[in-house]
A protein has these predicted regions:
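Carbohydrate-active catalytic/glycan-binding domains of CAZyme proteins
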Residues: 1-152
Length: 152
């Protein structure tokens, strides 16, 4: 596995979006808390409070695509992981039950929902080489970082 530290040039601005169903205004930050993966030879960046994913084949030129509406698009600190033929996605919704989603096609979907049982912040899935799956979460000066083994 390789890691890169690269000042990727993507928009970082605030967006104001109106939810037409309940007449509320949402503010979205672009590029905060990024999670980047390489899936099938293409790079993807997911960020907090965002409606989109940035996509690149060379880590230099980036295009932005809107994600499906059923994803937690207003969540914080998205966690995106590749395991086999699937990409797993979730984002923090403290105080609310958080679900994971998986897909074989990030841009077009469909996304299969994996129902969660509790709320968390700053999630992180870990797929171990021995086939076990672990889930880590936590971000607080008052609470520890938590970990549990998941049924795979």
């Amino acid at each position: 596995m390789k890691y890169y530290c690269n000042p990727i040039n993507v928009n970082y601005r605030y967006q104001f979006n109106k939810d037409l169903e309940n007449d509320k205004i949402y503010i979205n930050r672009e590029a905060a808390d990024p999670s980047m993966i390489c899936f099938k030879g293409t790079y993807y960046i997911f960020a907090s409070m965002n409606l989109s994913v940035w996509v690149s084949e060379d880590l230099v030129s980036w295009q932005v695509y809107k994600l499906p509406e059923n994803l937690p698009l207003y969540g914080y600190a998205p966690d995106v992981r590749v395991c086999g033929e699937y990409v797993y996605f979730c984002a923090s919704e403290s105080g609310e039950k958080c679900n994971y989603y998986r897909t074989k096609d990030i841009i077009n979907g469909p996304y299969e929902e994996i129902e969660g049982t509790f709320g968390f912040v700053d999630p992180n899935l870990f797929f171990d080489e021995d086939g076990k799956v672990y889930f880590y979460w936590g971000c607080s000066d008052e609470n520890p970082i938590w970990e549990t083994e998941l049924n795979s």
